[in-house]
């Protein structure tokens, strides 16, 4: 549920600052990540601000948080292979010693509205940009679509178009970058039929969407976003089989590309705390210990400027200080 950037100005500023950070960081940083454990941890690109010093700070701390830095944004950004945001994130990977995870989105999760119609011209542009990006950067991970089961709920016809299109793009990417792991991303709570809590509906397991996994036979990884704090009042309420259930629906490698739990004493009825957030971090790794997940990405290093409860999901405060959840995340394996 990471939101797209606030317009072209912010995207341009992001690129400028990232390039500046690369110049300053230079060769003093390690060229490659250390050999990694079975589950690669990481955080999304979520600095305190778009100032140069804060970007440098983010990449330095990202090495403590894990091996991966993810970027999620408008699919069209892939087309700018000179200085687009995903291009710069991929380029800085060797400088700061992380593995980039690039996630290209084509619709708005809150409404289901397409960023642009999936007509022939758009599909051609999306496909060409993804292939060019993959050919140039040979990324280890490239996701096409974020929380696509939400699109299925809001616009089944657009979802059907994407399913066919995804298969075409998958084949084209593999032709130029065969080692890239290509996949789409689902929203786990909704996949389970959990639409209650802060989603505003009711929980109904008969509305589970597990069958959608079969619509993507070419997905190299089955990936999810997960925000159980939108459904459960505290981590102790999460069922023991909450994550292990996934294995009954697929034998493919698993990944969690967004993980989050808020730390604020709001919204009303869903009050949390920093201690509770840390408790969830520990609970998540305990509940997923037997899954051999390939990726575990926390949504925000720093609190983002967005609506609640996402605005208090950072592992660190906006002032730079660490929450208890930061220590839990760093030590988790």
Located regions from the model:
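Alpha-helical scaffolding within the catalytic cores
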Residues: 50-58, 83-89, 125-130, 188-214, ...
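N-terminal substrate-binding region of glycoside hydrolase catalytic domains
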Residues: 33-125, 143-149, 223, 228-229, ...
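Active-site groove signature of glycoside hydrolases
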Residues: 129-159, 183-185, 295-303
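Aromatic- and acid-rich polysaccharide-binding/catalytic face
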Residues: 71-76, 140, 146, 198-237, ...
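An active-site-proximal structural segment forming one wall of the substrate-binding cleft
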Residues: 115-144, 158-174, 203-217, 278-291
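Active-site clefts of carbohydrate-active enzymes
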Residues: 104-112, 186-193, 226, 248-281, ...
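C-terminal motif of bacterial Sec signal peptides marking the signal peptidase cleavage site
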Residues: 24-26
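Aromatic-rich peripheral "rim/lid" segments of glycoside hydrolase catalytic domains that contact
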Residues: 38, 55-58, 152, 266-279, ...
């Amino acid at each position: 549920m990471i939101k797209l950037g606030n317009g072209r100005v912010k995207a341009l500023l992001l690129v400028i600052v990232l390039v500046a950070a690369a110049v300053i960081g230079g060769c003093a940083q390690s060229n490659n990540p250390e050999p990694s454990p079975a589950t690669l941890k990481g955080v999304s690109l979520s600095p305190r601000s778009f100032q140069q010093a804060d970007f440098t700070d983010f990449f330095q701390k990202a090495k403590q948080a894990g091996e991966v830095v993810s970027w999620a944004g408008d699919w069209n950004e892939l087309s700018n292979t000179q200085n687009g945001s995903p291009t710069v994130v991929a380029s800085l990977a060797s400088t700061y010693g992380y593995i980039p995870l690039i996630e290209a989105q084509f619709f708005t999760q809150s409404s289901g509205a397409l960023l642009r119609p999936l007509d022939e011209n758009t599909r051609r542009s999306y496909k060409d940009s993804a292939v060019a990006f993959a050919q140039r950067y040979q990324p280890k991970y490239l996701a096409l679509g974020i929380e696509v089961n939400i699109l299925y709920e809001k616009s089944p016809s657009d979802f059907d178009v994407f399913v066919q299109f995804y298969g075409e793009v998958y084949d084209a990417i593999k032709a130029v970058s065969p080692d890239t792991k290509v996949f789409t991303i689902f929203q786990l709570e909704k996949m389970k039929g959990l639409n209650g809590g802060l989603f505003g509906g009711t929980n109904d397991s008969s509305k589970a969407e597990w069958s959608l996994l079969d619509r993507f036979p070419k997905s190299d990884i089955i990936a999810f976003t997960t925000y159980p704090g939108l459904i459960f009042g505290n981590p102790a309420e999460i069922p023991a089989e909450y994550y292990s259930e996934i294995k009954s629906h697929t034998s493919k490698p698993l990944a969690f590309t967004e993980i989050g739990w808020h730390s604020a004493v709001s919204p009303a009825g869903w009050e949390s705390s920093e201690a509770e957030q840390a408790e969830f971090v520990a609970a998540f790794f305990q509940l997923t210990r037997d899954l051999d997940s390939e990726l575990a990405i926390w949504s925000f290093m720093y609190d983002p400027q967005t609506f609640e409860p996402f605005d208090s999901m950072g592992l660190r405060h906006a002032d730079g200080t660490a929450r208890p959840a930061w220590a839990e995340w760093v030590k988790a394996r």
